[in-house]
C-alpha cells in the first residue's frame, strides 16, 4: 500500500487551480494546471506550466490563454522535446456566447518546447469537438485516444478514436 511521505502546497492564490499533470524531463520537474475563477466553463481559464529542480522552489515557465476556457493540460516528454496538450471550450460561432448553455465547441491545442522555458504558440490539432486526451510515444510514433461529440450535452453520441501522429501536429485515424 502506498504511504504519503510529505505534502506540499505549490500554489495558493485564491483561484480555482486544478486538472494537474506532472512529469520529469531534462533534470527538471514540470507541473501544469488550469487556473480560473471556478470549475465551470467560464473564460478565462488559462493553462500554467511550472518548473522545479527540487520540488520545493517553482518557477512559472509558461501561461497559455487562447481566449477560451483552456483546461486539462497533459504533458508529454519525448526525446529532445516537451509538449503540453489541452482542450479549449469556445462559444459556438454565431451564438451569444452564453456560459450557461451548451453552445460551446471544444478545440484541442498543443504547444512544444525544446528547452522547457520557450514554448511555441498553442496550435489547434485535429478537428472541432475532438478532445485529444493523453498523448503517448510508442513504436516510433505518437498515439492518442480522442473522444468526439457533436454537442457537449449529447453524452449518448460520444465516440472514441485512436489517433496516430509522426510529428505531434498532424493526426490521423
Residue ranges of predicted features:
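Beta-rich carbohydrate-recognition and catalytic domains
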Residues: 1-18, 23-70, 76-173
Amino acid at each position: 500500500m502506498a504511504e504519503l511521505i510529505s505534502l506540499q502546497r505549490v500554489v495558493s492564490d485564491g483561484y480555482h487551480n486544478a486538472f494537474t499533470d506532472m512529469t520529469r524531463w531534462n533534470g527538471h520537474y514540470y507541473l501544469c494546471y488550469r487556473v480560473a475563477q471556478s470549475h465551470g466553463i467560464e473564460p478565462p481559464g488559462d493553462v500554467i506550466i511550472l518548473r522545479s529542480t527540487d520540488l520545493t522552489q517553482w518557477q512559472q515557465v509558461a501561461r497559455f490563454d487562447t481566449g477560451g476556457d483552456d483546461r486539462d493540460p497533459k504533458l508529454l516528454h519525448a526525446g529532445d522535446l516537451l509538449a503540453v496538450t489541452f482542450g479549449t471550450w469556445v462559444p459556438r460561432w454565431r451564438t451569444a456566447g452564453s456560459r450557461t448553455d451548451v453552445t460551446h465547441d471544444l478545440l484541442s491545442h498543443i504547444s512544444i518546447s525544446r528547452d522547457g522555458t520557450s514554448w511555441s504558440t498553442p496550435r489547434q490539432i485535429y478537428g472541432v469537438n475532438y478532445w485529444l486526451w493523453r498523448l503517448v510515444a510508442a513504436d516510433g510514433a505518437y498515439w492518442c485516444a480522442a473522444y468526439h461529440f457533436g454537442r457537449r450535452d449529447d453524452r449518448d453520441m460520444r465516440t472514441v478514436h485512436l489517433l496516430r501522429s509522426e510529428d505531434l501536429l498532424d493526426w490521423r485515424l
